[in-house]
A protein has these predicted regions:
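Bacterial Sec-dependent N-terminal signal peptides
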Residues: 1-35
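Short loop/turn segments that connect beta-strands within beta-propeller blades
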Residues: 55-56, 101-105, 142-146, 185-189, ...
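Surface loop/turn motifs at the tips and blade-to-blade linkers of beta-strand repeat domains
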Residues: 64-73, 110-115, 151-155, 194-199, ...
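Solenoidal tandem-repeat scaffolds enriched in leucines and small polar residues
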Residues: 148-235
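Intrinsically disordered, low-complexity segments enriched in Gly and acidic/Ser/Thr residues
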Residues: 233-305
Length: 335
């Protein structure tokens, strides 16, 4: 009798264990500070995730959306926008924007209306602005009710979005060689002005009322300072493949291949090379990049199939922390 029962019990045990792996227990998160990381995942694989590093950089929590909600985030976490109350996670290939409580990361709402491969988002004046990969428009939603408000027509599809008190700046699609920054009046939500630059736009950031735009071609990279529609300053970096333009305090940062650079926002001085993140594919090694409080965050996507690394440096290139996160870490956002 025992010889008959034991295989049955063993089989039941194995079946139970394998099923329990598919069950996801929701956890109560209590996030009050730190940094969010969007892990893109693999295209068509539904394995995008979000990670969180605490404020003193001592602890990492992976897959916080799944932990908080008992379900996966979706397919390709492209970017996010963070407000005092909510985090808007743009999930490109799922055609969703997951709205979550900033503290608990519990899902509040899933925006789907009008979305067609959403890319980047910014919140201004109580409105959420969203760019689309293939459509020459920016979508506008109410940032509290999440209702669709309107579509703002552009000349070309846009990528990154930033905002100051006057405009939302929409940079033309980087991958199609766009050279146009289109300005949306934040009061009227109309495309009122355009600024044409000299090369393909490959970076966009804002500090106060000044918007900084990086462009590049095969041989040179440039940074422009825009105040409204006026180009107030520009510099030729004399470097190829400038990317990842970021601002922290009184400095601008960017990457070129595997090197990290710093430059004064006046753009009156030359860029200072800080350090190299290593040898190899600079695009993968700095797939994600941002700077907070003097700490330089890099997202190493590796082979874009296995889990990636977040490597945090000081300006002198000394290592602060290294963490294993999700697949293809592509962005860092302050709590």
């Amino acid at each position: 009798m025992k010889k008959i029962l034991l295989p049955i019990v063993a089989a039941f045990t194995l079946y139970s264990c394998s099923n329990s792996d598919d069950l996801i227990d929701e956890q109560e998160l209590n996030l009050t500070e730190g940094y969010f990381i969007t892990n893109e995942g693999q295209f068509n694989s539904n394995n995008a995730t979000v990670s969180h590093i605490n404020g003193n950089l001592s602890a990492l929590t992976n897959n916080i959306f799944k932990s908080a909600n008992g379900k996966v985030l979706g397919d390709v976490a492209q970017s996010m926008a963070v407000t005092d109350k909510y985090v808007f996670v743009v999930v490109n290939n799922s055609n969703t924007i997951e709205v979550v409580n900033k503290k608990t990361f519990k899902s509040v709402y899933t925006i789907t209306e009008q979305l067609n491969f959403p890319r980047f988002a910014v919140v201004k004046n109580g409105k959420l602005y969203v760019s689309l990969m293939n459509n020459a428009e920016v979508l506008v939603y109410n940032a509290e009710t999440f209702a669709f408000v309107k579509s703002v027509a552009l000349n070309y599809p846009a990528e990154q979005l930033v905002a100051n008190n006057e405009y939302v700046y929409a940079a033309n699609n980087f991958y199609s060689g766009g050279t146009l920054v289109e300005l949306i009046d934040v009061n009227e939500d109309t495309n009122t002005e355009d600024v044409t630059l000299n090369a393909a736009i490959n970076g966009l950031t804002v500090s106060g009322e000044t918007v900084y735009v990086m462009t590049n071609n095969d041989t040179n990279s440039f940074i422009y300072a825009l105040n409204g529609t006026t180009v107030s300053a520009t510099t030729d970096l004399e470097l190829a493949n400038g990317r990842n333009l970021s601002v922290d305090g009184q400095s601008l940062y960017f990457t070129a291949e595997t090197d990290v650079y710093k430059i004064n926002p006046s753009l009156a001085s030359t860029a200072n090379k800080l350090f190299s993140v290593g040898s190899g594919n600079g695009y993968a090694l700095t797939y994600g990049f941002n700077v907070f409080n003097g700490y330089i965050f890099t997202g190493n996507a590796g082979n874009f199939t296995d889990n990636g690394k977040v490597v945090i440096y000081k300006e002198d290139g000394s290592l602060v922390k290294e963490y294993t996160v999700g697949i293809a870490p592509n962005g860092f956002y302050k709590y």
